[in-house]
Structures are given as structure tokens and as C-alpha cells.
């Protein structure tokens, strides 16, 4: 609700949503059938083409079912957000010269590309530090994660007092990399990679 309320007041905006824009349309299943794979391999094809391409590149992502009813709550919330944004006039990135643009992103995939490999576990302290540093080093105006280390003393460490207020939560870091991706799409489009099939979003 807060997101759509904020965006309603914007004349121009590019929004990157960290969720699938729709269900899978069976494109991966059809591709695998053409490649004459075994029925067991085809059964494991419940994903969209974008998810398949990410997995081919070693990036583990959740597959999107073919039915919205079978999708987890976070995916269904994403579908609802896309519908709301489209009703507000947002159009898919690069379709037209629209003032309000929308793109799908995947935070884990973004961090894998930016880190040059699979980053450390997202909820872990070191994973949060790594993600924050990746964004900070790319000029995103956020807290310098290295300040975290300046706040650690022997006393604080012995008492289990960590300056976690200097770090963003995993959810905030996901939102920040999505925003960074949207910014790149507008200002440095040559630095983003488009994957998947337009039929699936």
C-alpha cells in the first residue's frame, strides 16, 4: 500500500519489482521436451524461462508454478503489485518511451552478478555486510558497512553487543538492489542483462 501511494504522486518513475510478474507458460517444459529429455527431467521444469536461464548460469532461484493458486504468498503478492502498477499506468521497460516504467528483477541474481559469484548467506552478518559493501562500492548512497568494524570493541564483543544498526536488513538490501537495478536500467541500460521470454513477463 505504501509503495503504490508513494508512486501515485510521481510524474516519472522506473520501478523494479523483486518478484515474478506472472506464472510460467510452459515454455521451459516445451523446450525440454524438444530436447528429448526423460519424463523425470521434464517434470522438474516448473519454472519460467528466466528462472531456467538463471539456473543454467549456476544461480539458484525458485521456480514459478503454472497456476497462481500454487504459487507461494510472496509470489502472489508480487502478482498483485504488478496489477496495481499496470492500472496506475506503468508499462514494461523498453516497450515504449513511457514516463512510468516497470521491470522485474531478482535480488539474489543481481547480487550474484555484482559479486561475480554466489554471495554469502543473505541473513548472515557477513552476507549482509557483503551485500551492503557491493552496493556502497557502486555509489549507492547508503551507510558505509566498514563503519560497522570501527564500532566493535573488546568490551562490546565480549558482551555480545554488535552495531547492527549500521547494517540494513536482508529485506532492505533486496529493495536497495532492486532500486539500483531500476536506476541502471534508466541511466546505464548497457549494464543490465535482460533474460527470459516476453510471453512470461
Protein language model regions, located:
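RNase H-like (RuvC/DEDD) metal-dependent nuclease/polynucleotide-processing core
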Residues: 1-201
Amino acid at each position: 500500500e505504501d509503495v503504490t501511494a508513494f508512486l501515485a504522486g510521481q510524474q516519472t518513475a522506473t520501478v523494479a519489482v523483486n518478484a515474478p510478474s506472472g506464472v510460467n507458460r510452459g515454455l521451459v517444459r516445451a523446450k525440454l521436451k524438444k530436447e528429448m529429455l526423460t519424463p523425470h527431467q521434464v517434470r522438474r521444469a516448473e519454472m519460467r524461462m528466466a528462472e531456467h536461464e538463471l539456473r543454467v548460469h549456476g544461480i539458484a532461484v525458485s521456480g514459478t508454478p503454472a497456476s497462481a493458486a500454487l504459487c507461494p504468498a510472496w509470489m502472489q503478492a508480487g502478482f498483485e503489485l504488478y496489477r496495481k502498477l499496470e492500472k496506475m499506468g506503468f508499462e514494461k521497460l523498453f516497450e515504449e518511451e513511457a514516463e512510468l516504467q516497470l521491470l522485474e528483477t531478482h535480488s539474489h541474481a543481481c547480487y550474484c552478478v555484482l559479486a561475480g559469484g554466489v554471495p554469502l548467506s543473505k541473513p548472515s552478518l557477513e552476507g549482509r555486510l557483503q551485500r551492503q559493501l557491493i552496493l556502497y562500492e557502486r555509489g549507492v548512497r547508503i551507510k558505509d558497512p566498514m563503519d560497522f568494524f570501527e564500532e566493535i570493541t573488546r568490551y562490546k564483543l565480549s558482551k555480545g553487543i554488535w552495531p547492527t544498526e549500521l547494517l540494513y536488513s536482508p529485506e532492505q538490501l533486496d529493495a536497495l538492489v532492486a532500486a539500483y537495478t531500476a536506476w541502471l536500467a534508466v541511466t546505464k541500460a548497457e549494464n543490465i542483462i535482460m533474460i527470459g521470454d516476453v510471453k512470461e513477463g
